[in-house]
């Protein structure tokens, strides 16, 4: 079993996507399964568990090198801030299947902020812009005296670097067809190679003004020159989606741009120059990327794991946001999704409808945790002894 670039490189050699699984992190916690070569169905929890099990094996080796005979069994696992409760539960379940004792599921932006604050001794209002391979979220938090108060979060669990790759693939195919190349009968191997090269071109455009895609058919060579300007144009709507989320999160936090002290860029996709330029134009600030955007989340998770093991961290317990003598870090979170109840349609009520039901929001998005909410429910008929609650998130 291979992962990441090694898996893609093997795929280009094998020439088959039959046993390839891409971006299943997006589908974890959803009723979606993938087909395997032997036609069995595997859900995203199992696929995630396979990846985590590989991490566990590597951690076992590291643990033995550190003198721990049983290796490393405890784990803190990070997830996108915009994950639902089902996705978080599924991730924790995947960790258990992989053999980990999951100490905590923590939001990736929070982990990144912990790493940055720990390394740079940073304080103040922090905006974390997290664009990974498959997901995107933005979080605004206040960091003061080792307390991390999440003010607002938003995101898109189906937007990431792979979507920018797909735009490149589409553009390359379109340009080659203009040159007379038939792109409708590509082999599986050619499709994998095209996707892999598109990702390489995207990476190259992060440091170069242009990149060339070369394609050969029966010894005849064709080329597509892609400039940063072209790449920016074909992905403009994706960039705009992230900008809208940033602005809405800032509004939800109750802050203004001049009140933001630090902007952290997290995730490999934030290396794209247009991301950094957009942030500069929006905020008037220079985004921070002096810590590796690929590893900053893991750094924060490891710091947090050490604090958890030593009972030096608490989550949302302190309503005043202050640390105690034993707590070196306090994390206060918010609900990333609104939570509501579905009721039968009532034409006199002005709610958002879902089929034959209307959704009544009970807990608005970005509500501070912990919280308690009460809602009065009324029987439809006299003597009604039971009812079904349909909960939305």
For the regions a language model picked out, list residue spans one by one:
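Oxyanion-binding/catalytic loops of NTP- or PPi-dependent enzymes
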Residues: 1-27, 37-41, 61-393
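Feature captures the FAD/FMN-dependent oxidoreductase FAD-binding
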Residues: 48-58
């Amino acid at each position: 079993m291979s992962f990441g670039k090694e898996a893609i490189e093997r795929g280009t050699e094998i020439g088959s996507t039959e046993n390839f699984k891409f971006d299943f992190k997006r589908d974890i916690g959803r009723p979606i399964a993938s087909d395997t070569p032997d036609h069995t169905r595997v859900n995203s929890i199992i696929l995630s568990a396979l990846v985590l099990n590989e991490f566990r094996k590597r951690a076992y080796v590291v643990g033995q090198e550190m003198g721990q005979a049983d290796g490393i069994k405890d784990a803190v696992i990070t997830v996108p801030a915009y994950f639902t409760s089902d996705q978080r539960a599924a991730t924790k379940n995947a960790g258990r299947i992989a053999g980990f004792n999951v100490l905590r599921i923590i939001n990736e932006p929070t982990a990144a902020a912990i790493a940055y604050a720990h390394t740079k001794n940073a304080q103040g209002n922090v905006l974390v812009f997290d664009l990974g391979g498959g997901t995107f979220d933005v979080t605004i938090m206040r960091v003061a005296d080792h307390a991390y108060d999440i003010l607002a979060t938003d995101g898109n669990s189906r937007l990431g670097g792979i979507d920018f790759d797909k735009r490149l693939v589409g553009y390359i195919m379109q340009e080659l067809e203009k040159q007379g190349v038939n792109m409708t009968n590509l082999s599986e191997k050619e499709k994998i190679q095209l996707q892999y090269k598109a990702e390489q071109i995207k990476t190259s455009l992060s440091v170069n003004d242009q990149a060339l895609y070369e394609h050969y058919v029966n010894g005849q060579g064709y080329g597509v020159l892609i400039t940063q300007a072209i790449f920016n144009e074909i992905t403009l709507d994706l960039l705009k989606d992230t900008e809208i989320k940033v602005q809405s999160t800032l509004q939800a936090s109750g802050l203004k741009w001049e009140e933001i002290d630090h902007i952290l860029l997290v995730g490999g996709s934030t290396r794209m120059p247009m991301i950094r330029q957009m942030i500069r134009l929006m905020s008037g600030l220079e985004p921070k990327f002096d810590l590796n955007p690929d590893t900053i989340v893991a750094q924060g998770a490891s710091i947090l794991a050490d604090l958890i093991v030593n009972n030096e961290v608490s989550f949302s317990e302190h309503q005043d946001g202050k640390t105690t003598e034993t707590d070196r870090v306090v994390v206060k979170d918010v609900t990333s999704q609104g939570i509501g109840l579905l009721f039968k349609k009532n034409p006199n009520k002005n709610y958002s409808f879902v089929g034959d039901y209307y959704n009544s929001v009970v807990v608005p998005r970005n509500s501070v945790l912990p919280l308690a909410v009460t809602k009065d429910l009324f029987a439809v008929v006299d003597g009604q002894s039971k009812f079904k609650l349909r909960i939305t998130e």
